[in-house]
Amino acid sequence: VAWGHTLEELAAALETGDAERAQRALDAARGLDDNTRALDEALSLGCETARAAPLRWADRAALDRQEEIGRHLDFAVRDTRVLARDTVRYVRANGSPVPDVASAVAGLGRAVWALAAAFDDPQAREQPRQLALRAAGRASEAIARHADLALTEIAGQVRSTAADLMRAAQAGAPDEDAFAEAATDEMLADPPDTPAGGQPTTPPDSST
C-alpha cells in the first residue's frame, strides 16, 4: 500500500538526512486522504447494504469491524501527514541522520503492512498490534535520548500514529481483549520525560 511505502521513505530520509526524499514522502502523505476517503465510502456502502438486506446480515459483523478499522486509520493517516511535515522541517533545518528515530518510523511502516494483511482476518490482529507497540517503544526511547525539540515532535507523532494503528488492529475484538485498549490509552497518557531542552509533544493539527 502507498501508506506503508510513504513511511518507509520517511524512515529512509531520517536515516540519511535526505531533504528531497523527505519532501517526496510528504507529498505522498498528503495524497493518502483520497485512499482513506474511498475506503470509508466503500465500507459505509457495504454496511448500509448489509443492514438493509436480510440475506447479508451474516456479513454485518465483518463489515462493522472493517468500518471501525477505517475510522482509526483516518486518524492514523492524519498523524502520518503531520509526521511527514515534521520530518521535512527537521531534515531541512538540521539534516543529521537519526537512525533511532528512523527505526521507529520504519516500525510504523511494518505495522501498516501487517494491518493491511489482517484487514479481512480478525485472527491476525496481534501482529500489527505488536509491531505498532514496538514502534511506539522505540519512539519513547528516542524522546528520552534527544534534546532536539523537532525530533521530540517526530517521536511523539510516531507514538500517536502507533496508538491509532493499535486501535485499528483491535477493532472488533471481544470484551476480554479490552486490556489492549487500556494499554494503548496508558501509552498515550504517560509519555516519557523529555530531556533537557526538549518539550512535551503537542497534538497534531487536524487542519494540516
Placement of each model-derived feature along the sequence:
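Soluble C-terminal extramembrane regulatory/interaction domains of multi-pass membrane proteins
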Residues: 65-198, 203-208
